[in-house]
């Protein structure tokens, strides 16, 4: 059986790893072993944070909606409850965008939500 030489493959693997680590500081961008460790961790962080980003944005949208709703005299919880009662299907991303870019339209939605809420706070939603 012929002997398998892996020098080319090994060099390519090392070059690729060092290229991926090109922006890092110190030994992490120059020494293969350090670069390999850092690139492995970096890829793991990227994978994790791509998923975390979705929750981060949802929390940001909720904060923006809550701030705008409170400026209009209603809490976030009651606002969302009122929108559901009024059968308005606008997602939080669009509500946050309206709150920032078009406060008049957001105020209209707040009035709509207030009108759809039951009078008694403790009464179950119909």
UniProtKB/Swiss-Prot annotation:
The keyword RNA-binding applies. GO terms for biological process: ribosomal large subunit assembly; translation. InterPro entries: Ribosomal_bL20, RIBOSOMAL_L20_CS, Ribosomal_protein_bL20_C. Residues 1-15 have a biased composition (Basic residues). Keywords: Ribonucleoprotein, Ribosomal protein, RNA-binding, rRNA-binding. GO terms for molecular function: rRNA binding; structural constituent of ribosome. CDD domains: Ribosomal_L20. One of its GO terms (cellular component) is ribonucleoprotein complex. Residues 1-20 are annotated as: Disordered. Belongs to the bacterial ribosomal protein bL20 family. Binds directly to 23S ribosomal RNA and is necessary for the in vitro assembly process of the 50S ribosomal subunit. It is not involved in the protein synthesizing functions of that subunit. This is Large ribosomal subunit protein bL20. It comes from Beutenbergia cavernae (strain ATCC BAA-8 / DSM 12333 / CCUG 43141 / JCM 11478 / NBRC 16432 / NCIMB 13614 / HKI 0122). The gene is rplT.
